[in-house]
């Protein structure tokens, strides 16, 4: 959820706000291609790599904005820790093979005092990955609700900012 805040919501809204519906649709098409075939396998190596690299370029700014929005949301959300969100965001935002994936994860992990990511299985193969955040406590089901609230608040902040910009330019 923390990673998908950027590519699932923040980035599409930014692309629609700047480039209109065509921009939002273009962004989602590239993002979906990356999700579906962006893996480096023999069948889709050239097309998949192109989709993955284009997705990296398109998400470069939105991922960083998402990390900042999630951090700001952590300052506003009762029970979340904005100071720790900022600390972990700055420390761990580059702990991922993708240049963009860890920004939101780091802010969310810090806000909720969680450790996210780590080793993962893909197509039956274990991939060693770094952890994001500190292992302050066990993850509990309520953390899903807290992460959702953090995401919704970050999205709400973005909407307010975009509406203020829209009102100012009209």
Region annotations inferred by a language model:
Residues 1-30, 35-170:
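Hydrophobic alpha-helical transmembrane segments
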């Amino acid at each position: 959820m923390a990673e998908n805040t950027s590519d699932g919501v923040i980035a599409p809204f930014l692309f629609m706000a700047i480039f209109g519906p065509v921009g939002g649709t273009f962004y989602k098409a590239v993002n979906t291609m990356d999700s579906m075939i962006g893996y480096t396998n023999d069948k889709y190596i050239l097309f998949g790599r192109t989709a993955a690299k284009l997705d990296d370029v398109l998400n470069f700014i939105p991922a960083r904005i998402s990390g900042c929005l999630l951090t700001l949301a952590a300052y506003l959300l009762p029970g979340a820790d904005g100071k720790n969100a900022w600390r972990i965001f700055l420390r761990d935002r580059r702990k991922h093979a993708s240049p963009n994936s860890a920004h939101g994860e780091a802010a969310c992990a810090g806000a909720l005092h969680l450790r996210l990511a780590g080793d993962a299985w893909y197509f039956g193969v274990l991939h060693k990955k770094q952890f994001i955040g500190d292992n302050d406590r066990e993850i509990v089901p309520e953390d899903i609700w807290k992460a959702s609230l953090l995401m919704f608040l970050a999205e709400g902040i973005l909407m307010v900012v975009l509406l203020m910009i829209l009102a100012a330019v009209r």
